[in-house]
Amino acid sequence: MLAWNNLVEMLGCSKASNEFIYLPQKLNELPVFEEGVLGDRSYYSFFNSGVLFLLEDDLVNQISLYIQADEGFSAYTGELPLPVNSRESEIIQVLGTPSGSGGGKMDMLLGYVNRWIKYKTESHTLHIQFDQNDQLCRVTLMQ
């Protein structure tokens, strides 16, 4: 499994970089590869590890960690900068006031949209989602 800092450092990496090439060895599984409709996005899904890498123009743009099993992904068990059982209020106590928030309601087309908060840093954005029971369910690092 990868350390949190290693995940953050992967943002912006090329798919030709050693960090990306050796991911299957570090996660002990081969990814399922899908290409976006327009061909500018690639998805590398490590279902057993609960990790999804989104690449745009062959660079790592987002890394999603499925804290709860969902969409065919197992629960991510690797390192996180916050407790896995956290509620939104607990994360805000640890990280401070988020730079943005939304969701937490039904959408006519999408169904329930998870509540989310995000934090922007100089190097990345941390997007955190909560399920209908206010439990942490997904953490996404974005460039």
From Swiss-Prot:
Subunit annotation: Interacts with cognate CdiA-CT but not non-cognate CdiA-CT from E.coli strain 536 / UPEC.
Miscellaneous remark of the record: There are 2 cdiBAI loci in this strain, this is locus 2.
Role, per record: Immunity protein component of a toxin-immunity protein module, which functions as a cellular contact-dependent growth inhibition (CDI) system. CDI modules allow bacteria to communicate with and inhibit the growth of closely related neighboring bacteria in a contact-dependent fashion. Protects cells against the DNase activity of CdiA, its cognate toxin protein, but not against non-cognate CdiA from E.coli strain 536 / UPEC.
Protein name as annotated: Immunity protein CdiI
Organism: Dickeya dadantii (strain 3937) (Erwinia chrysanthemi (strain 3937))
Taxonomic classification: Bacteria, Pseudomonadati, Pseudomonadota, Gammaproteobacteria, Enterobacterales
Gene: cdiI
